[in-house]
Amino acid sequence: MSSRRRSRTCPDAGFGAVSDMRPFYRRPPTSVGTGSSPAAGILRPPAGTVPPLPQDGGMPSSADRFRRAAVELAQTSERQVEWALAVADDARLLALIDELPAQHRQPSLLFSVARLLGVPDVDGAGFAAWFRSEWARVAPVAAERRTQTNEALRCAPLVAALERITEPGEPVALVEIGASAGLCLAPERYSYAFTASDGETRLGSGAPLLRCAVSGGAAPARLPVVAWRRGLDLAPLDVRSPEDVAWLEALLPPDRPERTARLRSAVETLEDDPPTIVAGDAAAELPALLDAVPPGLRTVVVSLGTLVYLPWAARESVLATVADRGASLVTLETEALLPHVVAARGERTAPEPTPFLLAADGVPLASAAAHGGTLSWLA
């Protein structure tokens, strides 16, 4: 296996090294699910059932990590909730997992490796049994990979943010950190159905059709004009590579076939003209990449769930580089990640709040679903 395959990127972000995994374990909401999720309406476990984070800044135990994952996964996958709870209660399996490097013990990574290696559609007990029996195959793959989910639906809030900061027809240079395979670097190549209180707004003509529910304001009315695009990732994936596409599919929940269909459609759209993705570290490579933007374009740097996984110093370096180059910045990150965005929000609220905040140039715009399926404007 080539060296490019040996350096995978961070959980669900597709980029960077994790120095502190605590941000991954957000405080769960009281209830989770959006109605479109198979797990809609699943309630948060009673108080006391979710173990507290270590107060000394240390790493949570593997058992605690999987129990917390079960709470978060209730938003997206009932099957993976079963898997997480079963692993959390299996001392033999936890002991095996603890032999992996710390940054490779994340539930999302291990579930994805299992999917890549052909785990059947089984309940929690069946998954734990399969995992133990196949550990000799699982361990080396888990030790060399890190998840880099690439969800094209995140283009829906991206389109909304770009409309707020660009003029109609203004050409944009789009630069994404943690780009994975680059599915979010081509928002104008897809089509959209934004559903708001005043009806449905359709934009674009490409595939897949990305559906987003909008509340608290109007739906976007135009797509961006992307004249130049580049991505940054420690280990870029290629939509033309069957191996890379198989990994992208393995990163998705087994009980969300619509996400797999959407991924395949986006891959098909991009495979004849894939975005260019530069291999490298965001803090180190972003300055040169921004310097390469052709003149006359509005430069927009995008982070769709990536900054949370960068070490603090690297995150600050990225923000400083964007400011120094006079570029715009669109972020879809956990709400408390960027203090200046939180401060700018003040007392503004969204009709349908989520743990994720869409912001542009430091101005908070809306709450949004982690994978882009809802957008709730702040007011």
Predicted regions: what is each one?
Residues 280-284:
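Conserved SAM/SAH-binding loop
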Residues 1-15, 19-31, 36-37:
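Low-acidity, Ser/Thr- and Arg-rich intrinsically disordered low-complexity segments
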Residues 270-275, 287, 316-317, 321, ...:
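Class I (Rossmann-like) S-adenosyl-L-methionine-dependent methyltransferase catalytic domain
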Residues 100, 120, 149, 168-279, ...:
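Class I S-adenosyl-L-methionine-dependent methyltransferase module
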Residues 44-58:
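Short, Lys/Arg-enriched N-terminal segments with co-localized hydrophobic residues
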Residues 299-312:
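A short SAM/SAH-binding and catalytic strip from SAM-dependent methyltransferases
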Residues 57-99:
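Non-catalytic accessory regions outside enzyme or core folds
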Residues 95-169:
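Class I SAM-dependent methyltransferase Rossmann-like catalytic core
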